[in-house]
Amino acid sequence: MSLHITSATEGQLQVHFTTKQKQYAVPDVPYSIRANVGCSELNTLLGTVLKDAGNKQGAKVAFDFLLNGEFVRSTLSQHLKERDISFEDTIELEYVERYPAPQPQDCLLHDDWVSAVQAKDGWILTGTYDNTVNLWNTKGKHKLTIPGHVAAVKGVAWISLNEQTGVFASASHDQTIMIWEWNMTTNTAECVHVCKGHERGVGCIAVNPAKTQMASGSMDTMLKIWSTELQADKGEPSATKKAKLEQDNVRTPVVTLAGHREFVSGVQWIDNTTIATCSWDHTIKLWDLSMGGIKTEFTGNKSFFDLSYSPLNGMIITASPDKNLRLYDPRSKHGNFVKNTYLGHSQWVQTCRWSTTNEYLFVSGAYDNRVKLWDYRSPKAPIFELIGHEDKVLACDWSNPKYILSGGSDNAVRVFKSRIAVDNTKDD
């Protein structure tokens, strides 16, 4: 199947197939193929090569193909022309097992809009516009409704979980964050701390990797850091005041960081001393807690509604009202922080979350009632669209690798089972 190419005008290309998934490797020889082939024809060819090599299992697998780190979503000739790549060059095509489609598993109905959701192990936390926090298991059973807030719950975050007890936090437009302790034996939840200090509604919270602190963003433009310890408070000074606050179970912030000019709409921990925030003021800021200030700042053209950081690849994905998601690399040294733009939604993109186990994948939810699953190597189109919501998608989560969750103004949490493709890309 190795041929000499005499002219690019013949519509032929010379390609090498390569993969990091060793169980699907083929001989490293050049193949002469038509330039106008797409993924379907490439799969047929690769299946034949695998079968001829005695890999009957591999011959049944569907693959996606990458050229220079980007998925091929058209014919090879069109892909090359759009990127001004010479037809005379030998093309190296990397192939990876196609990620299997997530399957709809459940619909968890609430009494009002679902504006926050996060899973941990077999449990799902939700926050709603009827001021409550709800607990579900991943089998779809509702376990507990927790009243306490006096305005919409806009953020939920697990702090710890064992066989007897769960500890989690909820953030609300009532300007407070509540830390809850859930007794699984009695199926009751007690508010052990009320975190007060924001002067307007709290829109987002996140817990650090060590589970010792949490960060919150608010309409008051402030970023605040709180202790998650259930014992002694480590709040701001004033011994008399502090004693009274502790007596009332009220917690004050460890640190308050000013810098944003509008609503702090998203917060994520990079590590235990670095926090990323986004805001309606068109900026993303990286904060260094050890020095108590801003380390890096990126400015965009639109407001940011949400962001998600991946420790697997070191990059940040953002959601914005211009229907786009953007990929940022905060490690960039030359000021070009935006690595790619993803257009696939038809209305405001409200929420986004990285996979916790696959460095390439993330999900997004938007006002077009759609949840989309993306591979960051495929900027022109999502790899799957997860259909089910009948109104705006307000929150999404992929904390548990098995489940993609989304909450919306249709009062529902949609649960999709995420089937994991075989991945042997890492060396033993």
UniProtKB/Swiss-Prot annotation:
The keyword rRNA processing applies. WD repeats lie at residues 109-146, 148-190, 197-236, 259-297, 299-338, 344-384, 388-426. Belongs to the WD repeat WDR12/YTM1 family. InterPro entries: G-protein_beta_WD-40_rep, NLE, WD40/YVTN_repeat-like_dom_sf, WD40_repeat_CS, WD40_repeat_dom_sf, WD40_rpt, WDR12/Ytm1. Keywords: Nucleus, Repeat, Ribosome biogenesis, rRNA processing, WD repeat. The lineage of its organism: Eukaryota, Metazoa, Ecdysozoa, Arthropoda, Hexapoda. GO terms for molecular function: ribonucleoprotein complex binding. Required for maturation of ribosomal RNAs and formation of the large ribosomal subunit. The keyword Nucleus applies. GO terms for cellular component: nucleoplasm; PeBoW complex; preribosome, large subunit precursor. Transmembrane segments: none annotated. One of its GO terms (biological process) is maturation of 5.8S rRNA from tricistronic rRNA transcript (SSU-rRNA, 5.8S rRNA, LSU-rRNA). It is found in: Nucleus, Nucleolus; Nucleus, Nucleoplasm. Residues 13-97 are annotated as: Ubiquitin-like (UBL) domain. It comes from Anopheles gambiae (African malaria mosquito). Pfam families: NLE (PF08154), WD40 (PF00400). This is Ribosome biogenesis protein WDR12 homolog.
